[in-house]
A protein has these predicted regions:
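Formylglycine-dependent sulfatase
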Residues: 1-307
């Protein structure tokens, strides 16, 4: 198998509140990925807050091992020499970033020590700019295999207002809030705003998936689509419960990640880096805490984690 292209599509604060997990949050692009790839019903983040979780899925390490124990813009740092771009770069990959990662202080562009070969210009993590920017990149993708990280700010507060011509506002009467929050007019309106925001996020993913098809890259591209942690609501994000740690995770591509499979065994976002290395033929660094999920998907093992 030739080295596949690898794309991480990650959203802020979405939890599992997307269509394939049985929630009435229309996300047809993520649903399409689930029907064509593999849906992980018990995927969890390594931390219930942004920077620690993101550092974990970019290094394959737990937060206490990569050093990111708090938010990057509040002074916390990770060991960027452990960032997956270095591992894949050594294996011959071109690496690109579009949108946000939130592992460095907020500023325009990526900090040089992040190690990306190319930063795709966009308006931060706004879906309206990330979708077209990534699509344009894919049309002229490099000849060598590439790793692309595309991060969206959508489903992070403050929820932007609905766009009636594109994403109509949701009727709050039919938008029950997530557990364990009370069902009130205020929480219903909040959930309606979240759902409108999720539509914007999903539309961005749809643009990128369509661009992969149009450029002829889809067949040899591993697409990993997921959220960093739970919803940015009380008793959800920042809590070490399923409400804070449970995330959607869908993977499509070569290596057995196809056919609309559903996996119920527990997996973690720290497993994404070793999985990428496994398919890329790259050495999995000794510091990685996660394990490749390819053997699980292909039925070679029954489980990956005991704790």
């Amino acid at each position: 198998m030739p080295q596949p292209n690898i794309i991480f599509l990650h959203s802020h604060n979405t939890g599992r509140y997307v269509q394939p997990y049985g929630h009435y949050v229309p996300t047809p692009a993520i649903q399409r990925l689930a029907e064509e790839g593999v849906l992980f019903r018990n995927a969890f983040a390594a931390a219930p807050t942004c920077s620690p979780s993101r550092a974990s899925f970019l290094t394959g390490q737990y937060p206490h091992n990569c050093g990111m124990l708090g938010l990057a813009h509040r002074g916390w740092r990770m060991d960027h020499s452990h960032h997956v771009v270095h591992t894949l770069g050594d294996a011959g990959y071109f690496t690109a970033l579009c949108g946000i990662e939130h592992t460095i202080p907020f500023k325009s562009g990526a900090h040089p020590y992040e190690g990306y070969d190319h930063v795709i210009e966009s308006q931060g993590g706004k879906a309206v700019s990330v979708g077209p920017a990534v699509s344009e990149f894919l049309k002229g993708a490099p000849k060598q295999p590439f790793f692309l990280s595309a991060g969206l700010n959508e489903t992070h507060r403050q929820y932007p207002p609905a766009e009636p011509d594109k994403y109509p506002a949701e009727d709050p009467r039919f938008c029950a809030p997530p557990r364990p929050l009370p069902n009130t007019p205020v929480t219903r309106q909040d959930m309606a705003d979240f759902k409108a925001c999720a539509r914007i996020m999903d539309n961005c993913w749809a643009q990128i998936l369509d661009a992969l098809d149009e450029s002829g890259l889809a067949e040899n591209t591993l697409v990993c689509c997921f959220s960093d942690h739970g919803l940015q609501w009380p008793l959800n994000m920042c809590n070490l419960t399923d409400h804070g740690l449970a995330v959607y995770m869908v993977v499509r591509g070569p290596g057995g990640f196809e056919g609309g499979k559903v996996v119920d065994e527990m997996v973690s976002l720290i497993d994404l880096v070793p999985t990428a290395c496994d398919l890329a033929g790259a050495n999995i660094p000794d510091w990685v805490d996660g394990v490749s999920i390819r053997p699980l998907v292909n039925g070679e093992v029954e489980s990956l984690h005991e704790e």
